[in-house]
Amino acid sequence: MGRAGGGGPGWGPPPVLLLLGVTLVLTAGAVPAREAGSAIEAEELVRSGLAWESRANDTREEAGLPAAGEDETSWTERGSELAAVGPGVGPEETLEASAAVTGTAWLEADGTGLGGVTAEAGSGDAQTLPATLQAPDEALGSSTMPPAIPEATEASGPPSPTLRDKPSLVPELPKEIPLEVWLNLGGSTPDPQRPEPTFPLQGTLETQPASDIIDIDYFEGLDSEGRGTDMGRFPGSPGTSENHPDTEGETPSWSLLDLYDDFTPFDESDFYPTTSFYDDLEEEEEEEEDKDAVGGGDLEDESDLLLPSQKPGVGPGTGQPTSRWHAVPPQHTLGMVPGGSISLRPRPGDPGKDLATSENGTECRVGFVRHNGSCRSVCDLFPSYCHNGGQCYLVENIGAFCRCNTQDYIWHKGMRCESIITDFQVMCVAVGSAALVLLLLFMMTVFFAKKLYLLKTENTKLRRTNKFRTPSELHNDNFSLSTIAEGSHPNVRKLCDTPCVSSPHARALAHCDNIVCQDDPSAPHKIQEALKSRLKEEESFNIQNSMSPKLEGGKGDQDDLEVNCLQNNLT
């Protein structure tokens, strides 16, 4: 370096570096490249390269502007050294040397970036590299060594001894650019925070996580074939028998469960204890259950009537129920078929009647209504048709009939037993009726009592007025006669009891009193006739008295008094 500082032109690198380079070239050509773990030799090469670079830079600065030939020679020597070092040294040494020249920071060979790289010198084959790689464009931009190598090769002067003995591999370096790039990429520092993706080998299937995608074989034959046809249908609906025929003429177990799962048997405890006529019905139900257990093939036809098919897109879980089972009060004339409707059974004495004609027609019989295309009884569709525990019956030509419940002190009435009559209501009606009768009797008693009181008051007033009347008022007043005519006899009897003044006409007075005091109803008429005849006699008698002398006047006055007394008695 001291010689270079003296300004001697054309001085090349020191001979120690040349010997080291020749040794490395020979070892690289005879022995395979070292592994990436040889970090000590790489460090030595980096140190020597740094020392050589500093010397060359100092020489160029002190020498000023040398000749073009000398400059080319010095750079040729430098380039030839690099060319000699390049093929003989492993790729890691080459990269480290280039990093020393370009100033790029590289990791050590035993770092995480080069842990998985294995390459042979000069082979150009890249093995599997780690995933923490930069983009190829970035690697090409960061590396400046490959374009400098061909320039040095073209500007080189006389070849070095190393180049004479062995052909230089400098032209082949551009072919190894991918390897260099990959090695540069491998030397970059990985991001510790970013996870490393894994790249599987070719030819091996990678296990993917479970997804929501379902195999298409499950939906095979959605249109018209396969098991997909039953997805939109309820078990037992029309169409299932064609796709899944019964193997031995027996329905599967699920059909029986779906048909009879919601069926509620009749429970006598729900009704009232009038169960004397249920014995025959229980026997009929047992016979029907035996027939259903033996003839299981008919259940499919019954399920077709019971469960009509739904729309294709609606499943059994989302659709509305097609039918419901309800507990129906049993009766002698009712026949309950599991898949059909409740209909009237013919009585033993009546001829059998076909119910299919009425069910298939437009109208249903009395007591039946159309539901889901079939005629069903009102008692079946509406379990609460009869209120207050009443029992619903179907009667021919009448329809639904409710038999109301009867208990102690409780009665029900109405067409559907909607009215309740309790013991309290009966008591209220009885007490109210008795109160009305008593009130009527009281009113009648008061009315007649008042009438009698008015009559008694009138009689009392009449008696008081008769005591204070003078004989002249009694003679001019006809009230006494009217009273006698009305049948009020007490006054007449009182007059009969009063004695009159004794007179010569005692015989006539006695006869007159006899007539008045009798209880004969025709007495008033007799009295009037007697008075008239008597008055005539008195008139004639009075005329005779007026013609008599005054001495006899005393006797005349006495006779007048007797006549007046008689008139008073008559009145």
From Swiss-Prot:
Q: Name one GO biological process term.
A: cell projection morphogenesis
Q: What ranges does the record give for the region Disordered, renumbered to this chain?
A: 57-91, 137-169, 186-254, 279-357, 538-563
> Per the record, which residues fall in region Interaction with TNC and TNR?
270-306
Q: Which residues cross the membrane?
A: 429-449
List the induction conditions: Up-regulated in nucleus accumbens shell by cocaine administration.
* Primary location class: membrane
> Where in the sequence is the signal peptide annotated?
1-30
* Residue numbers on the Extracellular membrane side: 31-428
In which tissues is this gene expressed? Expressed in cerebral cortex and cerebellum. Expressed in retina (at protein level).
Domain of life here? Eukaryota
Q: Which InterPro entries match?
A: CSPG5_S_attach_dom, Neural_ProG_Cyt
The cellular component terms of Gene Ontology attached to this UniProt record, alphabetical and capped at eight, are: cell surface; endoplasmic reticulum membrane; extracellular region; GABA-ergic synapse; glutamatergic synapse; Golgi apparatus; Golgi membrane; Golgi-associated vesicle membrane
Q: What membrane topology does the UniProt entry give?
A: Single-pass type I membrane protein
Q: Which UniProt keywords apply?
A: Cell membrane, Developmental protein, Differentiation, Disulfide bond, EGF-like domain, Endoplasmic reticulum, Glycoprotein, Golgi apparatus, Growth regulation, Membrane, Neurogenesis, Phosphoprotein, Proteoglycan, Secreted, Signal, Synapse, Transmembrane, Transmembrane helix
Q: Where in the cell is it found?
A: Cell membrane; Synaptic cell membrane; Endoplasmic reticulum membrane; Golgi apparatus membrane
User: Region Interaction with GOPC: which residues?
Assistant: 447-465
Q: Which residues are glycosylated?
A: 38, 57, 76, 123, 132, 143-144, 153, 156, 160, 162, 198, 240, 318, 322, 372
Disulfide cross-links: 379-392, 386-402, 404-417
Q: How does it assemble?
A: Interacts with ERBB3 and GOPC. Binds TNR and probably TNC. Interacts with MDK; this interaction is independent of the presence of chondroitin sulfate chains and promotes elongation of oligodendroglial precursor-like cells.
Outline what the protein does.
May function as a growth and differentiation factor involved in neuritogenesis. May induce ERBB3 activation.
Q: What else is known?
A: Different forms of various molecular weight have been observed. Such forms are possibly due to different levels of glycosylation, phosphorylation and/or protein cleavage.
Q: What is this protein called?
A: Chondroitin sulfate proteoglycan 5
Q: Which organism is it from?
A: Rattus norvegicus (Rat)
- Which gene holds the coding sequence for this protein? Cspg5
